[in-house]
Curated annotation (Swiss-Prot):
Main localization, broad class: cytoplasm
Entry note about domains: The PRC barrel domain binds ribosomal protein uS19.
Domain PRC barrel: 98-177
Location in or out of the cell: Cytoplasm
Keyword list, A-Z: Chaperone, Cytoplasm, Ribosome biogenesis, rRNA processing
Lineage, opening ranks: Bacteria, Pseudomonadati, Campylobacterota, Epsilonproteobacteria, Campylobacterales
Source organism of this protein record: Helicobacter pylori (strain HPAG1)
One Gene Ontology molecular-function label: ribosome binding
Name of the protein in question: Ribosome maturation factor RimM
Its job: An accessory protein needed during the final step in the assembly of 30S ribosomal subunit, possibly for assembly of the head region. Essential for efficient processing of 16S rRNA. May be needed both before and after RbfA during the maturation of 16S rRNA. It has affinity for free ribosomal 30S subunits but not for 70S ribosomes.
Disulfide partners: none
């Protein structure tokens, strides 16, 4: 399951929900699309997920309406939970442009700079509208006293190329970030 957003407060009398989007693809939130709601930390517990169907989504207002939620009381039960979509459904609904990737496809890729393996992407975080690769440093570099984990901004200055078929990200200047972490 992929995290699409975080559900905020109840809005209005018809069960509207403020949605704090975690995705770059709001067009996936269409009427009739199946989504799941669960605590944010529920990734590994399938029993935590409750399924819903989207009634509508107003992107300008970040308002989500689910088909079976029609009262503020029912909406409040979902406050502070995560909105999830299956990986297959996400890939079916979201059309990627050249150079765009799903986070789930980038996690696990090797980070390489000048033929030196720096580590693996373990997570992607968005901070102030910038995506960062959270990289677990390779053991040999950690043994040399470098940080166990470091961040690489997803910017051209650092990221040269993403090769999904080779399962690697080639970088430039990322080792300097590691050395200064």
């Amino acid at each position: 399951m992929l995290l699409v957003g975080r559900i905020g407060k109840s809005v209005g009398l018809n069960g509207g929900l403020k949605l704090h989007l975690e995705s770059d693809f709001p067009e996936c939130l269409k009427k009739g699309v199946k989504v799941s709601v669960a605590p944010i930390n529920a990734f590994s517990r399938a029993s935590s997920f409750k399924d819903y169907v989207i009634h509508s989504y107003e992107h300008a207002k970040n308002l989500l309406f689910l088909e079976t939620i029609h009262t503020p009381e029912k909406a409040k039960e979902l406050t502070n939970l995560g909105l999830f979509m299956s990986e297959a459904e996400s890939k079916k609904l979201c059309v990627l442009k050249e150079g765009e990737f799903f986070y789930c496809d980038l996690v696990g890729l090797s980070v390489v700079e000048e033929n030196e393996f720096l580590g693996k992407v373990i997570e992607i975080q968005r901070i102030s509208q910038i995506d960062y690769f959270l990289v677990e440093t390779t053991k040999s570099l950690v043994e040399k006293g470098l940080a166990k984990i470091f961040l690489i901004p997803y910017r051209d200055f650092y990221i040269q190329e993403i090769l999904l078929q080779d399962k690697k990200i080639t970088t430039h200047n990322a080792k300097t970030l590691l050395e200064n972490s």
